[in-house]
């Protein structure tokens, strides 16, 4: 069974509470439950990590090497737009990574329309609500074989 690490960045722990018109009403724990259920159906094992701190996210990406993680799904939150350190960590571990976003970042404020993370990833999925994570699971399943 392939191991998929799902990393969620700043403020994603507040899903279902913050800006429901943008991020929906599903809370964070329910999101993890939905992802786990679909991953099991796809014969994928998921591990979850959430942090509001850039360094902790980088450390978790590095730790993925020791755990023989096969793929990463990352929603870097606001770090999407300026964290070259997370970009570099993804490049360093060389694990297929998909960047996801609940909202369509290209239909939002100007500063949100640029990702410095996406160029380090095999792909980016944006704008499908929490289904963005499910689409990413299908994509990684295909990529990993």
From Swiss-Prot:
Protein name: 3-dehydroquinate dehydratase
Record bears the keyword Amino-acid biosynthesis: yes
PROSITE patterns: DEHYDROQUINASE_II
PANTHER family referenced in this protein's UniProt entry, alphabetically: CATABOLIC 3-DEHYDROQUINASE
Disulphide linkage map: none
Binding site for substrate: 75, 81, 88, 102-103, 112
Site, as annotated: Transition state stabilizer: 18
Pathway the protein takes part in: Metabolic intermediate biosynthesis; chorismate biosynthesis; chorismate from D-erythrose 4-phosphate and phosphoenolpyruvate: step 3/7
Record-linked Pfam families: DHquinase_II
Catalytic activity: 3-dehydroquinate = 3-dehydroshikimate + H2O
Protein encoded by which gene: aroQ
Species the sequence originates in: Caldicellulosiruptor saccharolyticus (strain ATCC 43494 / DSM 8903 / Tp8T 6331)
GO molecular function ontology, one term from the record: 3-dehydroquinate dehydratase activity
Keywords, alphabetical: Amino-acid biosynthesis, Aromatic amino acid biosynthesis, Lyase
Catalytic residues in the record: 23, 101
EC number in record: 4.2.1.10
One GO term (biological process): aromatic amino acid family biosynthetic process
The UniProt record lists the keyword Amino-acid biosynthesis: yes
């Amino acid at each position: 069974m392939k191991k998929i690490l799902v990393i969620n960045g700043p403020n994603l722990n507040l899903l279902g509470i913050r800006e429901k018109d943008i991020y929906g009403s599903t809370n964070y724990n329910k999101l993890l439950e939905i992802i786990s259920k679909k991953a099991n159906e796809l014969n994928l094992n998921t591990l979850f990590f959430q942090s509001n701190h850039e360094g902790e996210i980088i450390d978790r990406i590095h730790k993925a090497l020791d755990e023989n993680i096969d793929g990463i799904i990352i929603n870097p939150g606001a770090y999407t737009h300026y964290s070259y350190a997370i970009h570099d960590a993804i490049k360093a571990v060389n694990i297929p990574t998909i960047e996801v976003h609940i909202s369509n970042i290209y239909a939002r404020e100007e500063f949100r329309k640029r990702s410095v993370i996406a160029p380090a990833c095999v792909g980016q999925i944006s704008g499908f609500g929490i289904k963005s994570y499910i689409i990413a699971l299908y994509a990684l399943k295909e990529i990993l074989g």
